[in-house]
Swiss-Prot record:
Its cofactor is Mn(2+). Its EC number is 3.5.4.2. The keyword Manganese applies. This is Adenine deaminase. It catalyses: adenine + H2O + H(+) = hypoxanthine + NH4(+). Disulfide bonds: none annotated.
Length: 565
């Protein structure tokens, strides 16, 4: 789609017909805030003409629709959509997301550089522009067992790849502050390049030190106060609205025309059911405006501010010389895409059909011995017990304690007190490690659920109140190469196979969406009250998010950054 300078100049001047002209649209100018009736002329993958009338080899009547720049998701894990990059492309690009900046650390935690290279190769074939941040924390800490370890020397050979922006979210903020040698080696290798942050609840001088290490952007702010401190200290704040982490409403008071040059939008982890039912970045735009944010501020955060934050200077405006990423909307408030152009390509079934393919990686990645019911016993002779407390809609958890008397040497789950057993079993074939504990907040009255989506090490996680059902669900995931399963009374009630690394399906996103509906219904039948129980479960194993978590190595006190005895 790259055209000669001569063609760009001639088509921009109207001396030659443009390759594509969007006629009768109204540009929403993100610099001035004006709505202006005009044609948009496109040559190859570039916009060459605005604020004038043009003729084109192909012309599309926009019928008065509002034209805005393509949306940019500034931080996400494609794997959390539970489909391959190709299906993710087909799922979200028609909604106006023309650029996505991904951190493939989910697949990297399973198969290392092979997973990152898979994303880089896939990105060459997509309709959207998928950019990659190199995964900085694989594993996220020393308190878990992943399928791979990536050091600075592993990442440096990929840093100049044209699809790579920089270093992905640096989750091990305690390691940065402690000047851990491995952390400093990665930061030094990417010094002067874009380094994305991840520092939940980090404040004061500790935050200063973290930022001073060269970290520029951050998406973990969950309150306006936290986000404002990060803005004041020069960070670009990425407002997040995922399937579990829902921070938009809390941060929307900051989404003003004054702050919008330093704010972006991201989804982080969003599954295809939520995308189908509610949307993606388009959902965030609608929601923010409904909550009172000015449309100019919101659309800036969705495109122009995002482009500038990540050094993508060729996009973010509908203007000559910019990448031809254009979304035609019914209204600014409705944000429903009637037409999407991505890099000069009209997004339709033909565009997706014309893509190349890449062979998936990390098959047969669930390497764990058969699980017995007795594996879920929790021995102990002391009643005082740490309990992970779920906060619905948050990935931060509470560090609770409860008196749980052992029975025959086993501290057992108690549905009447909303105390379920949680277990994480190492599944990469490394050491066979296993840890068990308690979680409150699922509301589970019977059965079990299991998942190999278990951030970020992606071991096998199980929650239940019946040990036999927990073993049944875990063993079913061994058989189907990973995924999700719901079990009760000795039967599998629902499942979704995720054979690509135990993370992604090979099925169309519509089928994955339908399977998620069945899984949620089955989980509700167990008494589960959480809207998104599987992603909520996944984040209970992430030891870089306060306050209490569990990995295959034990119960983790995140505030003290240590495994409890």
């Amino acid at each position: 789609m790259r055209r000669s300078l001569s063609d760009l100049i001639d088509q921009g001047r109207g001396k030659a017909p443009a390759d594509l002209v969007l006629k009768n649209g109204r540009i929403f100018d993100l610099v001035t805030g004006e709505l202006v009736q005009t044609d948009v002329a496109i040559c190859g993958d570039r916009i060459v003409g605005t604020f004038g009338t043009y003729e084109g080899r192909r012309e599309i009547d926009c019928r008065g629709r509002i034209l805005v720049p393509g949306f940019i998701d500034t931080h996400l894990h494609v794997e959390s959509s539970l489909v391959t990059p190709f299906e993710f492309d087909r799922c979200v690009t028609p909604r106006g997301i023309t650029t996505a900046i991904c951190d493939p650390h989910e697949i990297a935690n399973v198969c290392g550089l092979e997973g990152i290279r898979y994303f880089l190769e896939a990105a060459e074939h997509l309709v959207m522009d998928l950019r990659v941040q190199l995964s900085s924390c694989v594993p996220s800490t020393h308190m878990e067992t992943a399928g791979a370890t990536l050091e600075a020397a592993d990442l440096v050979p990929l840093m100049d790849h044209p699809r790579v922006i920089g270093l992905a979210e640096f989750m091990n903020f305690p390691g940065v502050l402690a000047k851990d040698a491995g952390c400093l080696a990665k930061l030094e290798a990417f010094r002067g390049r874009h380094i994305d942050g991840h520092a939940p609840l980090l404040r004061g001088k500790d935050l200063n030190g973290y930022i001073a290490a060269g970290i520029r952007t951050e998406h973990e702010a969950t309150t306006a106060e936290e986000a404002l401190e990060k803005l004041r200290k020069g960070m670009r704040v990425l407002i997040r609205e995922g399937s579990v982490s829902r921070d938009l409403e809390a941060l929307v008071p900051l989404l003003t025309e004054r702050h919008s040059p330093y704010l972006c939008l991201c989804t982080d982890d969003r599954n295809p059911l939520d995308i189908a039912e509610h949307g993606h970045i388009d959902h965030m735009i609608r929601t923010a405006i409904r909550l009172g944010a000015p449309p100019l501020a919101v659309y800036r955060a969705a495109s122009l501010s995002a482009a500038e934050a990540f050094g993508l200077k060729d996009r973010g405006l509908i203007a000559p010389g910019k990448r031809a990423d254009v979304v035609a909307l019914d209204s600014l408030e409705g944000c429903h895409a009637g037409l999407v152009v991505a890099g000069g390509v009209v997004v339709d079934a033909g565009a997706f059909a014309a893509r190349g393919t890449v062979e998936p990686v990390a098959r047969a990645s669930v390497r764990v011995a058969p699980v017995e019911a007795a594996a879920f016993r929790c021995p102990g002779n002391r009643a005082e017990t740490p309990v992970i407390g779920i906060l619905p809609g948050k990935i931060i958890t509470e560090h609770l304690t409860d008196a749980i008397e052992p029975v025959d040497g086993d501290k057992r789950p108690d549905p009447s007190r909303d105390l379920a057993r949680i277990a994480v079993i190492e599944r990469h074939g490394r050491n066979g490690g296993r840890a068990v504990g308690f979680v409150r907040g699922f509301g589970m009255r019977r059965g079990a659920i299991a998942s190999t989506v278990c951030h970020d090490h992606h071991n096998l996680a199980v929650v239940g109140v019946d040990y036999a059902d927990m073993a049944l669900a875990a063993n079913r995931l061994r058989e189907i190469e990973g995924g999700f399963a719901v079990a009760a009374e000795g039967e599998i009630l629902a499942e979704l196979a995720l054979p690509v690394g135990g993370l992604m399906s090979l099925r169309p996103f519509e089928e994955v969406r339908d399977a998620l509906v069945a899984l949620r219904e089955a989980a509700r039948g167990l008494g589960v009250t959480l809207e998104e129980p599987f992603l909520q479960l996944a984040f209970l194993a992430l030891p870089v998010i306060p306050h209490l978590k569990i990995t295959d190595r034990g119960i983790v006190d995140v505030d003290r950054f240590e495994i409890l005895p």
